Amino acid sequence: MTEKELIESGNMKMEWARNHMPVLAIIREKFEKEKPLKGLKVGMALHVEAKTAVLVETLAAGGAQVAISGCNPLSTQDDVAAALDTRENINCFAKYGCCTGEYYEAIDRVLDIEPDITIDDGADLIFKLHKERQEMLAKILGGCEETTTGVHRLHAMEKDGALKMPVIAVNDAMTKYLFDNRYGTGQSAWDGINRTTNLLVAGKNVVVAGYGWCGRGVAMRATGLGASVIVTEIDPIRALEARMDGHRVMKMSEAAKIGDLFVTATGNRDILTADNFKVMKDGAILANSGHFNVEIDMEALDSLAKSTRTVRHNIKEYDIGNRRINVIAEGRLVNLAAGDGHPAEVMDMSFANQALCVRYIAENKLSSGVHGVPRELDTYVAKLKLESMGIATDELTSKQECYMSGWECGT
């Protein structure tokens, strides 16, 4: 593609996403009128694709100067990045397929604008800020974190006394994790797997590692596709819930022997290891739905492999002697490294929370540490989404309100 064609392609993708994100459209309209971010700089490290671009445009419409880099080497869509870079008050430093050095160099370029507010997906930007650019922390009003993995990382920093700025855990908003993590991950993970493998899911043993909100979504959609789902877990309550939802539950050491297709969704490392690879079926397929590429032990798989080859775009086959194992998208985030990410309708809510939380940070002085999304913002996003869908809800009568706040009325 020429640069012009690249920009046109990105603009078309952004228009499509924009037309399916009505909540963010309402917020953008308010931002354009009120300019709540005028004079502020926002530094972002997110998956640079069409839905993210709509959020970036919304912040710029609110008066912010925005700089953005990627948060995964394989999730950037270069046409969207090119289109974003043509917008006023927006600089995009992301590119697809960058090496580790280039990845962090792009984050450095975002930090070079000296942002007042940050938005992260995985906390790499905040980590870089604390590790190498500490002199900037005094200027930072706060940040937002998009994903479960990043929130875990921030809580660990806070526990160690290392977090020196306020960060809102956008991931923990109900209008984020109940929809984005469950329905978004459930649909987009299988979109990435199906478009990459072009294989039938029905009748296969699908092993889902982790039964948090992302894992539930993956398991739910696998069931809908006709798979026999096996869940592995470390949490007894989640394991019990998975069983009551109709899935088989067992240790990974046992599941590894019978799985046809594996999807990791834990947010932790070394979920699939050398011991697992050695007992897997010939032709087993591995995909990761967690943020970082550490859930599948790729170093161990590389060391076991006698040879490797690309058998299909985005699928690498590892011949470990008596069996072949196929890995999708280098073990990176399958829904974005092998697909287009979550549907626009769920990202509409997630990014609405991001935009509102950026404004909240700009208008309120927060203490250092991890903060929840204010309940009123969470509820506001839900109401706007319902209105956009033409759905009305009931309201409590005065008698019902009195009953719910009282204690004297019993049997």
From Swiss-Prot:
InterPro entries recorded: Adenosylhomocyst_ase-like_sf, Adenosylhomocysteinase-like, Ado_hCys_hydrolase_NAD-bd, NAD(P)-bd_dom_sf, S-Ado-L-homoCys_hydrolase_CS
Entry's Gene Ontology molecular function annotations: adenosylhomocysteinase activity; trialkylsulfonium hydrolase activity
Cofactor(s) this protein cannot do without: NAD(+)
EC number(s) from the headed UniProt entry: 3.13.1.9
Pfam family, one: AdoHcyase_NAD
GO cellular component, one term: cytosol
PROSITE patterns: ADOHCYASE_1 (PS00738), ADOHCYASE_2 (PS00739)
Gene Ontology biological process terms in this record: one-carbon metabolic process; S-adenosylmethionine biosynthetic process; S-adenosylmethionine cycle
Pathway membership, UniProt: Amino-acid biosynthesis; S-adenosyl-L-methionine biosynthesis
Catalytic reaction equation(s): S-inosyl-L-homocysteine + H2O = L-homocysteine + inosine
Keyword terms, alphabetized: Cytoplasm, Hydrolase, NAD, One-carbon metabolism
Role, per record: Catalyzes the hydrolysis of S-inosyl-L-homocysteine (SIH) to L-homocysteine (Hcy) and inosine. Likely functions in a S-adenosyl-L-methionine (SAM) recycling pathway from S-adenosyl-L-homocysteine (SAH) produced from SAM-dependent methylation reactions. Can also catalyze the reverse reaction in vitro, i.e. the synthesis of SIH from Hcy and inosine.
Additional note from the record: SAH is a product of SAM methyltransferases and is known to be a feedback inhibitor of these enzymes. As a result of this inhibition, organisms have evolved efficient enzymes to metabolize SAH via different pathways. The pathway found in methanogens differs from the canonical pathway, it uses the deamination of S-adenosyl-L-homocysteine to form S-inosyl-L-homocysteine for the regeneration of SAM from S-adenosyl-L-homocysteine.
Protein known as: S-inosyl-L-homocysteine hydrolase
Organism, as annotated: Methanosarcina mazei (strain ATCC BAA-159 / DSM 3647 / Goe1 / Go1 / JCM 11833 / OCM 88) (Methanosarcina frisia)
